[in-house]
C-alpha cells in the first residue's frame, strides 16, 4: 500500500451501484466500501460521490417505469436519497466508520462564500475521520442550478477537497479508441496527457439507463480536474480491487495526468465555480499576450462581446475562430465592455464616465483553458 497520505475522490455511477439492474447491488457496494476502508486504514482520506438516488427510490417504491418528468425524478430522488445514505451508513458501519452526507447544487459552488463554506464543511468531515458521502441535491435542484451529472460534480468536489486523485468508476474499463460495445477492434487508451477534439469525438455522449453520465461527461470531468492538478482515472467499478489498485499505482483503466502547475485556490474556483454567462472575443495580439505572456486582458484587444454578465461575472474568452482560450472574472459588465471594446485603457473613463481600473480581466482572475 502506498504509504504517502493522499485524498481520493471515488465517484460511483448508477450502473456500478446497480450492476446494470434496476436496484442497488448491496453485495457489490460492501466490496467497494471494504476497499475504501482499507485506504483509510492506510492513512488516506476518502470521499465518495454517489449516484443512485433515483434508482434507490424506484426500488423502494416499486415504481413501475423509468421516470420521465422532472417532478417524478425529484420524487424518486427525495425518497431514494434517504435509502441511499442509509445503505452507505449501514455498510460503512460494518467496519466502524462514520459517514456524513453532503447534498450540493450548482448554486453552492457559484457563490464564492458558499463555495468556501462547502469546502470548510468537507474538510471538517475529513479531519474528524468521517467519510463524506456527496450527491447532487436532485430533489430540489432545477435545471438552472443543477451541476447536471455526478461526473462533473465529482471533479468539483475534488477541487473543493484539494484531492490528489479522482477515480471515476463506471461499467466500462476506461476510454477506448472506439465504442467497445460496437467495435471489437477498440483498444483501451491507458494514459492521456492532453484532452483534445479527437478524444472528445471518441468519447461520444451515451449514458446509462438510470444514470445521466456517459463517457463524454467523464472526459469533461477529467479535463476540469486535471487542470486543478488532480490525477484522474476512469476504470470499471466491477474490476477486482480497482480502488486500492489505483492508489497503489497499479494499472487500471485510463489515467489522465494532471497539468504540471496546479491552480491556486481562487483560480480553482473560477474553473469549478460559476458557469459563464457570456463570451468575449479577443484578437490575435490579445491571445498572445494572455497565453504567452500571462498578461491581463485589456479592452483594446476585445473585438466582440456576447451574452449578458454583470461586473464580477464569469465570461468565456475565445479567439476570432471561436476557440476557447480562458475563463475569467470580468471587471466590467457585458454592456460596458460592448462600449469600450477596441478602446485604449486611458479612454475608458471618457466613454463610460467611470472606470473600475485599466484592465477588463486581471490576470489574477483569469484561467487559461
UniProtKB/Swiss-Prot annotation:
Gene Ontology CC terms: cytosol
Binding, ATP: 11, 170-171, 212-218
GO biological process, alphabetically ordered: L-proline biosynthetic process
Superkingdom of source: Bacteria
Catalytic activity annotation: L-glutamate + ATP = L-glutamyl 5-phosphate + ADP
Keyword Phosphoprotein: no
MF term (GO), any: ATP binding
UniProt keyword annotations, A-Z: Amino-acid biosynthesis, ATP-binding, Cytoplasm, Kinase, Nucleotide-binding, Proline biosynthesis, Transferase
Binding-site list for substrate: 51, 138, 150
Locations listed in the record: Cytoplasm
Record's function text: Catalyzes the transfer of a phosphate group to glutamate to form L-glutamate 5-phosphate.
Protein name, as recorded: Glutamate 5-kinase
